[in-house]
Amino acid sequence: GNVAPRVEALVARSCPSARLRRVQRVQNKMLWREYAHYRDESLVHTCAGGDVNEMLLFHGTAERAAEDVLAHQNGLDPRFSNGGFYGQGIYLAEDPSYPIGGRYAHRISGSGGSRVQLLIVKAALGSQQEMGQRISAETRAMRMPDVRVEGPPRLLYDSVRGGPHRPFVSGGGENGCNASIVHVV
């Protein structure tokens, strides 16, 4: 469906001085099929009550234009991550002010930093490992979430959430390439 009205409401609520210029939908059908298969055939069987915890979340692409990031064969790829409080991964926010206000949104050249773009992606986050406010050398070195169930089978958490701004951190497979580029002034 059309996400523009929802995005506009989220931007207006969290960034009252910003104005949504446009929402540009980008869909890679192959990556979307992979995402839907992961969500419907794999993740659904390991989540409590089958809840894959699917959400629309914002992602900043920093110095790289959103179009360039989405042109990659794997879509959002955690291997391009510079790391963060919870290691290398795709950092996703419920609130667009987190990537816009930080150094995460892509600043459009020639606009003096007043025009930015970021992504809004559909992500199936599955079972989250809640980190609270815990940040340490150990959390920064994380390569994957911790073990959730010793099993058998042994199950890991599917994503991590924590820190002062409460982003979600995922490993990549759960991010569908049903993304939209959000242009904000």
Task: Walk through the language-model features, giving the residues of each.
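ADP-ribose/nucleotidyl-moiety interaction motifs
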Residues: 1-185
